[in-house]
Amino acid sequence: FTRLYWGLRGRKFMYPGRKDTVKACIYVKELVCFMLYRLEHHEQGVELYNCTFEPAYTIEQIVATMNKVTGLNRTAPLIPAWILMPAAAVIGCLGAPMGICPARVRKLMVSTNICGKKLADSGYHFHYTFEEAIADWFKDNDNQYLK
């Protein structure tokens, strides 16, 4: 979420096409805790897990949490896809070093809504809520910025 933080902080973040895009995620410290848990409670065979908070969060919920935890209190406009995609194509053709191109914009508008129900039902107890994860990440950076 580092790019999101800097985009919000610099007032450069806009919702690309919609606010309800689901972005499944997990805090890296939580992932490590879960992996250690599975090593201790491993049954025979191979098990696959989608490691994500369950239910997954929308970009609007992620932005609201980022604002709350970091104290940014930024609003972000919604740019309709019919405006954003052609603009991204033009910016991409100009070779502007903004990291904006149609493929990246499309990726931002597509939900990564993977199901974390198996992890949630595994007996593992999360150490962090989503809000606590963002707060811990921010604290690790002296409550000043995110690296």
Indicate residue ranges for each PLM-predicted region:
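NAD(P)-dependent short-chain dehydrogenase/reductase
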Residues: 1-33, 66
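Short, surface-exposed alpha-helical segments at coil->helix boundaries
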Residues: 1-2, 60, 113-116
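Conserved loop-to-helix N-cap of the C-terminal "lid" that shapes the substrate pocket in Rossmann-like
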Residues: 19, 24-32, 41-42, 48, ...
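A conserved catalytic-core signature of glycosyltransferases
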Residues: 20-21, 52, 109, 114
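Conserved C-terminal active-site "lid" loop/helix of NAD(P)H-dependent oxidoreductases
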Residues: 28, 64, 87-125
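Short, amphipathic alpha-helical "lid/cap" segments that border enzyme active or binding sites
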Residues: 28-36, 131-135
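Mid/C-terminal beta-alpha module of Rossmann-like enzyme folds, strongest
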Residues: 37-100, 134-147
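Residue-level detector of short coil/turn "hinge" positions at structural boundaries
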Residues: 74, 126-127
